[in-house]
């Protein structure tokens, strides 16, 4: 089983998505997706570890988009994960954010 490839986005959208991740997501998910952001310890259940290989394998890009736009409750996960409905009308930025999340998976050692 392979991790779904990150969406292709232009460099400016990727940069904007990285800044958006740092502002909206990193406080809980951590700067590298390790669920170690400054607010992570206060959140129950703990934020998803986005760098987790099994999560990356099982989460499709479409599901990730859905969680981002509609919140965790939309996929039967924690309602603590807030929705970002503004991103539904910004597909390049949304795809950029998915690409940022995909970048957290590090290659397995050979």
Over which residues does each language-model region extend?
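Flexible gly/pro/ser-rich segments immediately N-terminal to CXXCH heme-c attachment motifs
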Residues: 8-15, 54, 83-89
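Conserved functional loop/turn residues at catalytic and ligand-binding sites
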Residues: 24, 32, 54, 72
């Amino acid at each position: 089983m392979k991790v779904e490839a990150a969406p292709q986005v232009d460099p400016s959208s990727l940069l904007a998505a990285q800044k958006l991740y740092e502002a909206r997501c990193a406080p809980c998910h951590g700067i590298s997706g390790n669920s170690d952001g400054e607010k992570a310890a206060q959140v129950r259940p703990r934020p998803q570890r986005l760098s987790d290989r099994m999560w990356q394998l099982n989460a499709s890009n479409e599901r990730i988009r859905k969680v981002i736009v509609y919140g965790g409750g939309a996929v039967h996960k924690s309602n603590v994960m807030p929705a970002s409905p503004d991103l539904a009308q910004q597909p390049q930025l949304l795809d950029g954010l998915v690409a940022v999340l995909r970048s957290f998976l590090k290659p397995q050692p050979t």
